[in-house]
Design a protein with these regions (language model features):
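Acidic, Ser/Thr/Pro/Gly-enriched interdomain connector segments
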Residues: 2-12, 27-29, 33-96, 152-156
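A glycine-rich, coil/turn loop motif that links secondary-structure elements
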Residues: 68-72, 92-103, 118-125, 251, ...
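Stable alpha-helical elements in mature extracytoplasmic
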Residues: 75-79, 98, 102-105, 121, ...
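Secretory-pathway/luminal and periplasmic proteins that interact with or process carbohydrate-rich
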Residues: 114-118, 134-139, 195-204, 268-272, ...
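Short, functionally critical alpha-helical segments immediately adjacent to catalytic or ligand/cofactor-binding
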Residues: 122, 182-199, 206, 262, ...
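Active-site or metal-binding loop neighborhoods of secreted/extracellular toxin and effector enzymes
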Residues: 277-319
Length: 319
């Protein structure tokens, strides 16, 4: 058989219905060679365009996520375990970072720790996550952390393991997420322990209600009652907490939603932004305690001595 290849199609002279006729004399040729060639070229052009589109999508995915093809399921499980420890993830540790739950957890972590909110893993995200988790674990496992947690042991609903967890997460946020030194973080945490005991669902005490947890409190931006880690009180600040938690798909009592709210305050609120900048310029416990008290938290009772005392105790444990 005399086979010719034209545009990827095979044709043969002996395909003719009657011997002796050449290809130009065929009456029942099943296809036209020129049309077939044009069809094949067009098909190739379409495939080329589709491939280019896919190549661009693949390149964009790599560029935005930093995902390396060498990542393994175990690598991704480690990411999920770390997100779980920091309170961002509660789903199955299956190594799939493309589920809605995993992407939400990553995006919320990125928001809290000041990274681009892609919802995808990258080397930068992985490094920050590892640093935050390492910091959390080191603090949570401290044998003498009870010196700090006992500051709120007088409350009837006190649970040492719970305060240990909250404190460790808060310390990791301010040290790894907000870049504070040990002196600065001690001053900030001295204030937070005095205000809320590091409990995110703590509402301002009333004459009849003095607990760490206020699970029955109905969050109201206009009621003038302090709430959360730093006891957000005025309408604008409580509204920001409500909006931030909603954007993250979390309740207002979630500790990470409150971290994200505080970060946003330091970035957009002129007074808080200026005070935060000043705090970070001074590496002293008393200065950071005072600035956080009077310029950032600004409670009615300016009890500096109590807060500074707590800050020094925290520093003695955390240094």
């Amino acid at each position: 058989m005399n086979v010719q290849n034209v545009g990827g199609y095979q044709t043969g002279i002996d395909y003719l219905p009657a011997a002796g006729k050449n290809i130009s004399e065929r009456e029942d040729v099943s296809f036209n060679v020129e049309e077939a060639t044009a069809e094949k070229v067009n098909e190739g052009a379409i495939k080329t365009a589709e491939q280019k589109t896919q190549d661009l999508k693949d390149a964009y995915a790599v560029m935005t996520s930093g995902v390396n093809s060498t990542r393994t399921t175990n690598d991704n499980k480690t990411v999920q375990r770390r997100l779980t420890q920091l309170g961002f993830y509660s789903g199955s540790v299956d190594g799939n970072l493309y589920t809605d739950a995993s992407k939400k957890a990553l995006k919320n972590f990125q928001r809290v720790y000041g990274l681009a909110q892609t919802g995808q893993i990258s080397n930068m995200v992985q490094d920050k996550l590892k640093a935050a988790t390492s910091c959390y674990r080191a603090v949570a496992s401290k044998s003498d952390l009870g010196t700090i947690t006992s500051m709120v042991s007088g409350y009837s609903d006190f649970k040492e393991s719970e305060i240990r967890d909250y404190f460790a997460k808060t310390w990791a946020f301010f040290r790894v997420g907000m870049g504070l030194t040990v002196h600065q973080a001690s001053g900030v945490l001295g204030n937070i322990m005095a205000e809320s005991g590091c409990v995110p669902d703590n509402a301002q005490d009333t004459g009849t209600n003095k607990k760490l947890h206020d699970k029955d409190y109905k969050f109201n931006v206009s009621d003038g009652r302090g709430y959360g880690l730093i006891q957000w009180t005025i309408k604008e600040r409580k509204q920001l907490l409500k909006d931030t938690s909603s954007q993250m798909g979390l309740p207002v009592n979630d500790i990470n939603a409150q971290f994200a709210c505080f970060r946003k305050e330091t970035e957009r609120d002129d007074m808080t932004k200026s005070a935060w900048k000043t705090l970070k310029e001074h590496d002293m416990i008393d200065t950071s305690t005072g600035i956080f008290l009077s310029k950032i938290e600004n409670p009615k009772v300016q009890n500096f001595d109590e807060r500074y005392s707590k800050a020094k105790i925290i520093y003695s444990v955390m240094k």
